Design a protein with these regions (language model features):
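Aromatic-rich, lipid-facing transmembrane alpha helices and their immediate juxtamembrane interface loops
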Residues: 1-283
């Protein structure tokens, strides 16, 4: 009979330490798996993956815990573990995608280019891989890891280690969330800059048309004046863009690298132009 907690977990603190360390282990293993998978697909070492700054993807850790808890450590039939594991982990991924989109108004990943996807949040390929990972987790990986953690509990190291890791984990979450919020705010400012420039350009176009139709003033003189104003408006916009770029922090930059398909819900065009501008600054 499977029991999620070993017999040594007799207090809430010990149960927390055991659960949190499992979460950390599978989050790190998940991050390693994603790095290997993405690097193999690109045939080169890919940019660091994940929302957090550390080598960790909590979505994998939470997915592993959900599978272990809901399947009582795994079904006797590996095929059933595969099917249920695929469903459970896909549910975790879908909910995470939806929640992060609502929180930050950005689409962090999109599987629309894959066949058999659901709203671009989950796809059959990943669900199949998650199902296989669930079989490996329940029938091979978790038993020895659980034994190792039991020894760690017995040694008295598990509780202080879990508290230290919790402090680091929460700090990482705060910094990453702050970076995402700042990135969202930066896109709003970028949208305003391009909107202001567009309004000025439209006003100048209207003025130029009026001059051409009226023929009351020398066209050359007004053409030179409009060209100067246009150049001034563009220079002002470029200056604001440089200020936005110079004031972005390392956490914002990392998020853009970690999520190549990151898309803003409210400002998709601003996100596209921002990425293009960043690429031009790199050259």
């Amino acid at each position: 009979m499977f029991s999620f907690f070993p017999p040594l977990c007799t207090t809430p603190l010990l149960k927390f330490a055991y659960t949190f360390l499992l979460l950390m282990i599978y989050s790190v293993l998940g991050w390693c798996s994603e790095m290997i998978y993405c690097s193999a697909g690109q045939r080169k070492l890919c940019e660091k993956r994940g929302f957090l700054n550390g080598p960790i993807c909590p979505i994998y850790g939470h997915g592993a815990l959900v599978v272990l808890l809901c399947l009582d450590g795994g079904c006797k039939n590996p095929l059933l573990t595969f099917l249920l594991g695929a469903v459970l982990t896909s549910l975790v991924e879908y909910v995470t995608s939806y929640a992060m989109e609502k929180l930050f108004h950005m689409r962090w990943w999109d599987y629309s280019q894959y066949k058999f996807h659901l709203n671009g949040r989950v796809c059959l390929l990943n669900s199949t891989l998650f199902g296989l990972a669930s079989v490996f987790l329940c029938h091979f990986a978790n038993p020895p890891i659980a034994l190792w953690l039991t020894d760690l509990l017995a040694s008295g190291v598990a509780v202080p280690l879990s508290l230290i890791l919790l402090a680091v984990y929460l700090t990482d979450i705060v910094l990453s969330v702050r970076g995402a919020v700042q990135l969202s705010g930066r896109l709003a400012k970028l949208h305003a800059i391009y909107g202001e420039l567009s309004e000025k350009l439209e006003a100048m176009k209207a003025e130029a048309r009026q001059i051409v139709h009226s023929k009351l003033e020398p066209l050359t003189e007004h053409g030179s004046e409009l060209a100067a104003r246009l150049e001034s408006a563009r220079a002002e916009a470029q200056q604001k863009l440089r200020a936005l770029y110079d004031h972005q922090n390392v956490f914002e930059r990392r998020l853009l690298h970690s999520f190549p398909t990151l898309r803003s819900i409210h400002y998709p065009e601003a996100m596209k132009k921002w990425k293009e501008y960043i690429e031009t600054r790199k050259k």
